[in-house]
Amino acid sequence: MLCPWQFAFKPHAVKNQSSEEKDINNNVEKDVKVHSFVKDDAKLHSLSKKQMKMSPIITSAEKHPQNGIKASNQISRCPRHVKVRNMENGSSLLDTLHLTAKEVINCRTRACQGALMTPKGLVRSTRDGPVPPAELLPQAVDFVKQYYSSFKELKIEEHLARLETVTKEIETTGTYHLTKDELIFAAKQAWRNAPRCIGRIQWSNLQVFDARDCKTAKEMFEYICRHIQYATNNGNIRSAITIFPQRTDGKHDFRVWNSQLIRYAGYQMPDGSVIGDPASVEFTKLCIELGWKPKYGRFDVVPLILQANGQDPEIFEYPPEIILEVPMEHPKYEWFKELDLKWYALPAVANMLLEVGGLEFTACPFNGWYMGTEIGVRDFCDVQRYNILKEVGRRMGLESNKLASLWKDRAVVEINVAVLHSFQKQNVTIMDHHSAAESFMKYMQNEYRVRGGCPADWVWIVPPMSGSITPVFHQEMLNYVLTPFFYYQVDAWKTHIWHDETRRPKKREIKLSILAKAVLLASLLLQKTMAARPKVTVIYATETGKSETLANSLCSLFSCAFNTKILCMDEYNISDLEKETLLLVVTSTFGNGDSPNNGKTLKNSLLTLKLLRKNIRYAVFGLGSTMYPEFCAFAHAIDQKLSQLGALQLTPVGEGDELNGQEEAFRTWAVTAFKTACDIFDIRGKNSIQLPEIYTSDDSWNPKKHRIVYDSQTMDLTKALSDIHGKNVIPMKLKFRQNLQSLKSSRVTILVKLSCETNQEVHYLPGEHIGISPGNQPELVHGLIARVKDAPPADQTIRLETCTEGGYWASEKKIPACTLSQALTYLLDITTPPTQQLLKKLSQLVTAEGDKQRLEVLCHSTEEYNKWKFYNRPNILEVLEEFPSAEVSTAFLLTQLPLLKPRYYSVSSSCDMTPREIHLTVAVVNYRTRDGQGPLHHGVCSTWLNKIALNETVPCFVRSADGFRLPKEPAKPCILIGPGTGIAPFRSFWQQRLYDLEKKGIKGGDMILLFGCRHPDMDHIYKEEVEEMKRKGVLKEVFTAYSRQPGQPKVYVQDILQNELETKVCNILHKEEGHLYVCGDVRMARDVAQTLKRMLVKKLNHTEQQAEEYFFQLKSQKRYHEDIFGAVFPHEVKRI
């Protein structure tokens, strides 16, 4: 006979825990269990002691039975509580509730499994028979105890009577049934115990619908329809659960096959694309195979597939009127409606299992209401879902080709704004993720007060956006399983035993033996096919990961026809070089033309090789920035070395400019390399190879996709620039401008002072950068407008619109509504030489055959293009003058010209010394192209700052430069090296030190300035101010290098560094742990670094390797600071 009392008065754990069951928090045995039925235990014991002898309750003071295990082998018992801390406010909570945890959900191995989607401990599989009574009874007793413990007043008699009833029912039938009140209690507790739910603060308000009398799938459907209508409530969403009959023997289960009651279909098309929700593709196929007629829309609600009493499933379509959907719109962006998005109002999970006291309810759909990010981030933005992020970013005019622009973050915020706005406008319940996080913190604190714990899965609780600015991010959490509980289940269609085999979806079942043979055969055929293909090795070197991304893309492309593998350069064995058939190299250039760190080994190994015994083929693509003179230098060095070794170049070196269409350039180069390789290696069927989608986009200009419409609004330049660049642009005024060079000098360096409006403030630190958004020269703008065939009136505001795939016109958000003159002056880059991609599109607009032929050569020959570009350095107006038959439209310029990027300058003032002002030191750039014989070109920003009138607006913003700040310890000595305008940030340094000395009484450490210029009477800028700083004790010593004194040898800063400051520099850096700052162009910085390394070799008796390591340590310790800018003008042009 079954006896409940042996379980009723034991601790919470019924059976002795073996070493296999570990506590999920401490990974030790659960030797201690807390008795959850605390109040009046003695009374209940006295009532039952006639029937049985009560087993002692285990406490932490009692000794464990030996059980034949040596004491030395015992695992220490887990603590009575675990402390969870809040990193934000320093508070802590003590969790004891976890001691009653039921399951081991993960982390029983050495590898943490906390981020797995469905750990084994959270999944319940099917059963082959009923739960044995001996297993069921203790779980039933435990649940009954939990239920009666929930009452404020004890109901001992009712509790005992219920225990006897349950015991008899299990004894006679093998199972038992919950009362309706117990079912309601269980459902609410299961929600309360759900560790992955952030919205549990509403757990006690759950509406429970008891559908245990249901017999058929049709009745299930009727219950679910009533559930949806109740829960939707015209948008005022109410949480509810419908519970169908419990599992009996595992062969008569009730199941809802859908993962959610409402979900959109996903249709896999023949070309591999998906219409609708990609997450629903598999289930949608199942619906179609079961007889549902697809509609092939983006937002088709899939039907319900319901299984009653273990029978084959039936399919039901919802009446349209019971599904509430919310069309998406944005409070600011009108074009958001044009995306034609919507979402259903009711989130209802349908495929989980409710476990209560050993009973399993396999069909129990339940709902809450949406948190905005569930739709706005996961459903709309996940790559594997609707994936609208890039489209939204494009419409917002964001730089989606540059991750550092944070375009994804800006776009996802606006998408979530749209979701919240749309639901609120339709009066449909939704909660933003910040409010949800706040409510969870309140719930968690209350649960610790009431229950002594709160199971929570941090990975799921923290919302998918905003991270550490939500309070839950900073809260430690314990994750454990209590009972009652909602478990995951294996998809029903994967386990269902069909009664009518004719209705079974076609699974194309194959016997295991046949399948094994087929797999083996396919494997052998694949190996044979791959072995027959020419081998290609792709190697890459990277600092930021961009080269690796492109190398993987290249590998995918070549895998269409070649046997490819990919390696990082530091994994590549140089001895394999002669074994290669085709070697593809993708690499960035680091610093002053050096290799990335993971390319140095290969670089050194290549230098040791003399000649290859086999003629391999190769191709190289380089990434870099044309701001620097050593653009793609490492890529060219590899190309040159491989050529010297006798390797054959497949295609010319490709170059990807970070500032101008890098990915476009890579795709063009990659396709060219692939097609050339297919020709050389005579690949069969090369003309019918299906390339990856990324390589098949059309680069041609289609004028029918764009149009210009007139607009009445005027552009707010500051707001427009803020939106375009994602910066807090401040409209400052030009207060003062002074030429710092002598009037006898042919060059100009200006001190620019900008001031705030009276109602504004600006904050910055010495050494930080100021971004200036300049204007292009009026002469250039007017000349360009004169070449536009459909230029609108000068003062007419225009708006660019693009035709979408659906055929409607949408405003293009790359640039706002403005006049053409404003766009060409402030928003678009008209001075940078056009890319090959732009020239290719321009070739469509020329009418003269000669122009067309020349443009075709420039488009397809990288060598010719580079010669042309570096010799002419043409702006877009000069290009149109070179190809006079080109007829460009307003839409062409607005869509094809790149955005005008801000120019950055080191701040030359102290915010404390000159509040509400920004001072800049600017070299005005003028140069002639074509070896000095070409047209006169001007630096965009420097010329603009030198020509605008006083009090004219200068849009600017502050950019942090964390690596170029004064020492945190003011007493540390500093060496400042800055020739020319490299002195700019050091002026902010000495002004700050002077302010600290005179206003705060803080005496800074020794500061030595090493300046360089051409001639003492020409361009020795800030000479008097520097002398004053020396007199006041702010600067201890000042050294100046003059490179153009008549009759004197050229002296540069690195010469003085080595000849006059060798001992001093080594003492400051090595003994006094001081700081060294270098500001200037990249060549000077490289020379200073090399000089310093030679000094270290000499003064510290270091080897070259040790000097390199010491130099690296200085940088790591943030005691060697560089503020380096690219060459102001390239080698091929001559400055005047």
From Swiss-Prot:
Cofactor list: heme b; FAD; FMN; (6R)-L-erythro-5,6,7,8-tetrahydrobiopterin
Sites where the protein binds L-arginine: 260, 369-370, 374
Record text on cofactor binding: Binds 1 FAD. Binds 1 FMN.
Residues the entry annotates as binding FAD: 769, 903, 905-906, 921, 923, 927, 940-942
Entry keyword Nucleotidyltransferase: no
Tagged with keyword Nuclease: no
Domain FAD-binding FR-type: 727-967
Family, as annotated: Belongs to the NOS family.
Protein name: Nitric oxide synthase, inducible
